[in-house]
Amino acid sequence: MSFVVVETFAHSMMATLSQTKELLRRADAVCFDVDSTVIKEEGIDELAKFCGVGDAVTEMTRNAMGGSMTFKTALTERLSIIRCSREQVNKLITDHPPQLTPGIRELVEHLHQRNIKVFLISGGFRCIVEHVAAQLNIPLHHVYANRLKFYFNGEYAGFDESQPTAESGGKGKVISMLKEQYGFKTVVMIGDGATDLEACPPASAFIGFGGNVIRPQVKERSSWYVTSFGELLKELEKI
């Protein structure tokens, strides 16, 4: 998922292409973005369309991309327009389940076979991301995403602002936490957007993904940029 990143990028040293490939091969863990990476869609845009406010939210996303507001502010304002109920979210998942990007199932399966831990880190919503994780046999405790809150009658009540993924720079915070919690030495982040790129460091390497949408800023700054998961699988199968 790509969104506004107010901070400037400060990568002191980006790994070279060959270094990035080597880091993937010997990774302890691989972290994937979800929206426009593991799945074809942007979850919040799909939810907005489903709730009949797609145009308004798309316009707000476009304005926010200019860097005029933080991730949390932009998320708060978009959700205040959508105001989805629990019933609407459940119906979206049932009627329009997230579509996996071709090749992701095979890639995750191969990573699991190599005993490389796989995590999903998303600025999207946990209720949707958990559905994706289940399809990929990723344990739910390996999912980090924002939690929607609802009143007892199912009406929208906001989101959990304490989650690291609710903040700008949140994906990097999650990776730092994973390294500390599990003792991972090498963690690779894969994603399509600026919030994924900025998670390296603390990630050991970043791989840009353009299989669903190509973001020029990310492509330019990625030492390894792929447009299909098959490219990553092919590299891993060389050994």
Task: Report each predicted region and the residues it spans.
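Alpha-helical substrate-recognition element adjacent to the catalytic core
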Residues: 2-147
